[in-house]
Amino acid sequence: MSDSPASPAPLHAQIDWDDQGLPHSRHYDDVYFSREQGIEETHYVFLEQNRLRERFAALAPHECLTIGETGFGTGLNFYCAWQCFAEHAPAEARLQVISVEKFPLTHIDLERAARLWPSLAAFSQPLLAQYVAVHPGFQHFSFDGGRVTLTLLIGDVLEQLPTLDARIDAWFLDGFAPAKNPDMWTPALFEQMARLSAPGTTLGTFTTTGWVRRALMAAGFTLRKVPGLGKKWEIMGGTFTGLPVDGVSSAPDAPWYRRPPAASGPRRALVIGAGLAGSATARSLANRGWQVEVLERHAEVAQEASGNPQGVLYLKLSAHGTALSRLILTGFGYTRRWLTNLQRGRDWDACGVLQLAFDAQEAARQAKLADAFDPSLLTAVSRERAEAIAGVTLPAGGLFYPEGGWVHPPALCQAQITHPRIQVRPHHQVLRLARVDGLWQAWDGDHLLASAPVVVLAGAADVRLFDGCADLPLKRIRGQITRLPATEDSQALGTVLCAEGYVAPPRAGEHTVGASFDFHSQDLTPTAQEHQGNLELLREISEDLHARLTRDGASSDSLQGRAAFRCTSPDYLPIVGPLADRAAFDERYAVLRKDARQVPDLPCPWLEGLYVNSGHGSRGLITAPLCGELVAAWVTGEPLPVPREVAQACHPNRFALRTLIRGEPAARRR
């Protein structure tokens, strides 16, 4: 995918509240819902026309119904759909709602709107509790133990829907009236709805405008008019019957990025590795009704890179819409919502992150970011303002990320992996996998440890021990952190400070300072030399804070810390998704060596049931939880929680593809 400048960050909805306490869009000069019959209209137009009550009741165990919506607005339709699902669906069924919103409400406005419907408080309050870090792109929410998910696509509907990889069962064709918002109600929108639908997909909409009706029919929907409610004479329901012969259909994905068949049979999986990636993957599968065994070679979870006392929720973004930047924005929001399950102050803290403009090049980079993103995500601050935020003297101003902070990674791992359908098996080191009678067997030498139809490799660079991953260009980078006892003076630090290194406010009486980068050493014994290097990184961040933390004159020989390996890929994107047989891949797509424009229509030789979640580098706190959801979506055939282009940019097959196109031999790395 080619990188292009990011669209300006969408502003929040500009709302006026009338004398009755109802919201009115200033931008569209239109109401969000009927003044007289808001809830009744939602039930009639969207729930009844899509027959949701009956369809929810008919769902099989673990079956998922997916709703697509154009215009999230105040969330009323979502609350009503969730309520209907909760009242009528079997206990093990699931609901996914995917909703586009160009101008999301602020938390204050969303909360004010929710107070209008006290009968829906059981459904609005969980959303309000998680309604943080809602920024452009895909924003993924999980409720009721993962039984209900919401993915908000923040941005213009004609930019967002083309990036969605999903199959929609029911459409809420909502939004401001066509006369007020003509840019949305276009044939291009209806063509995207058709692309995402299957025969039998239903829709409900309040509009019966003639050109809307004709454009929907041209896209493959059969429509019916039905009497409306109140002042609305008529509304429409419909069913997708298939694209007409001359309909517009999008080109299919290249075979190496198409989905493998969704897993069938027993819902059992093995996850190898109990760090951030493994625990997140296990939880995402367990939330979908899978029994998961986590095989961990250590005595406890989070013993390698995920075991540091503090990690930073820091967004290293691009001012352009790169795949990595989009992944970071989506992952940051998902992690921040996950953290609401943990104890603030002990397990994490939203104290913000201040990235110092430590030289002219960094200052120029930050200026571009400040122009590209909304101030709710990041804002440029002067040196004086930065010092007021930090509570210590600083050499420069920088960018402040108010929603950032620090996390105790072992606490996040433990929270993710604690689930009745997850069993952690410590001291289980998997050395070999074998596929026998439709099951993957995990072996430790001659000892069979466990077996299941699905295996997810989440052991950082050690995934290269196994077929399907042996050729992945993962590299290990040693990093060492230093733990400094907090002093009375250092307690003033009010935010995470970052430059070439970082320092966090105290947790459990200690600051974490880091981290070194060593591309050569394979020894994880902490060294005095690297402790001294971390102290120098601290000095560059703040001479003042350095003095406050080192006044007792402790030598670097006596300092405490730990070292671990980061695992990263050449393009700095994680490696997430289904794995293919590399030899068969090279043979099947060998024509690419001669002509990269060829796209052979040959199915990818998948290693059935084998997946990977690795290569998160120093961004695991932001990317690993979301990528657990991405793996689960690949496994189950559900909608992907990230844009299709981002999922492909993270796909394991990207490296085999590049090797073929460049005519390079595959280099197995063991």
Predicted feature locations:
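Helix-loop-beta segment of a Rossmann-like dinucleotide-binding subdomain
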Residues: 121-124, 319-320, 345-355, 383-418, ...
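Helical element adjacent to the flavin cofactor pocket in flavoenzyme catalytic cores
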Residues: 399-445, 450, 454, 458
